[in-house]
């Protein structure tokens, strides 16, 4: 597999973060969490040892897609009757395993993200789950405040990612990656880049990088109380990729109205090589900020 310069730069920077980050921030876990920083939030101390932290967004949407990938699920006895409307939801949580592993502003953490596409309206087929993706991670994270111009690097994360759909052949899909995640802020802007390097067996989906590329880019902007977001992945050599746009607005203190549009390849593992456009509306518990 090929690896881009972003991954090489991030890997080379790991010793620098381990040695230097302690001098740049005065005990992040003794101060309020930095807005939008996953790592700074996880460094906050709580009395309850079982406290879980949000990692990616947590949401529930009613969605409709332009096209359904029935060919990929033709081994299911209900595939011909699958509906284009689905409930899509994401659960994403993290837990700090060891705060201060490489200095006050570092941690060893684990996260678990699950995305599901549920045929809730398909009562004639007992409302099956068409696809669920399971994504555990183990990572080293650093909260930083290094600045270049008006931009401040807030999170630096280096870890291992496994993603699979938990199915047996012929619908089994999975891959393993080493990754880095760098997040920077400038006022109401947030930019995050997550390059990866694929490792291990990809026989279930040998050409997955053709459609999913070698990185994910995420951009967020806070406009008043609303949050506008965009993220996507793209392979510059093949011209394939996918993008997700989102808008959220608070309904209550802890619940936000959320609209999402996904277009392109790779919305789920079963659809990694399938092009579609999906529109959804629902609620969200946490956004980028």
UniProtKB/Swiss-Prot annotation:
Homodimer; dimerization is reversible, and the dimeric form is the active one. Residues 21-52, 100-105, 149-150, 187-188, 224-225, 251-255, 287-289 are periplasmic. It catalyses: a 1,2-diacyl-sn-glycero-3-phosphocholine + H2O = a 2-acyl-sn-glycero-3-phosphocholine + a fatty acid + H(+); a 1,2-diacyl-sn-glycero-3-phosphocholine + H2O = a 1-acyl-sn-glycero-3-phosphocholine + a fatty acid + H(+). One of its GO terms (cellular component) is cell outer membrane. It comes from the Bacteria. This is Phospholipase A1. It comes from Proteus vulgaris. Its cofactor is Ca(2+). It is found in: Cell outer membrane. It is a multi-pass membrane protein. The lineage of its organism: Bacteria, Pseudomonadati, Pseudomonadota, Gammaproteobacteria, Enterobacterales.
């Amino acid at each position: 597999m090929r690896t881009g310069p972003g991954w090489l730069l991030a890997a080379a920077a790991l010793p620098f973060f381990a040695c230097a980050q302690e001098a740049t921030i005065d005990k992040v876990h003794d101060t309020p969490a930095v807005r939008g920083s996953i790592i700074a939030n996880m460094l906050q101390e709580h009395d309850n040892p079982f406290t879980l932290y949000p990692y990616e967004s947590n949401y529930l949407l009613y969605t409709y897609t332009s096209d359904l990938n029935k060919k990929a699920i033709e081994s299911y006895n209900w595939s011909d009757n699958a509906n284009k409307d689905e409930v899509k939801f994401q659960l994403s949580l993290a837990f700090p395993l060891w705060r201060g592993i490489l200095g006050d502003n570092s941690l060893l953490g684990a996260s678990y993200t699950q995305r599901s596409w549920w045929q809730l309206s398909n009562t004639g087929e007992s409302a099956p789950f068409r696809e669920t993706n399971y994504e555990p991670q183990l990572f080293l994270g650093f909260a930083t405040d290094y600045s270049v111009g008006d931009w401040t690097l807030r999170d630096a994360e280096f870890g291992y990612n496994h993603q699979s759909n938990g199915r047996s052949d012929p619908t089994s899909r999975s891959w393993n990656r080493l990754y880095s995640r760098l997040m920077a802020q400038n006022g109401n802007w947030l930019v995050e880049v997550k390059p990866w390097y694929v490792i291990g067996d990809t026989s279930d989906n040998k050409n997955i990088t053709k459609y999913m590329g070698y990185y994910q880019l995420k951009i967020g902007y806070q406009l008043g109380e609303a949050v506008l977001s965009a993220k996507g992945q793209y392979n510059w050599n093949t011209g394939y990729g996918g993008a997700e746009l989102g808008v959220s607005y608070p309904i209550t203190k802890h619940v936000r109205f959320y609209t999402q549009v996904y277009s392109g390849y790779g919305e789920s593992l079963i659809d990694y090589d399938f092009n579609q456009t999906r529109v959804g509306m629902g609620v969200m518990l946490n956004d980028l900020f």
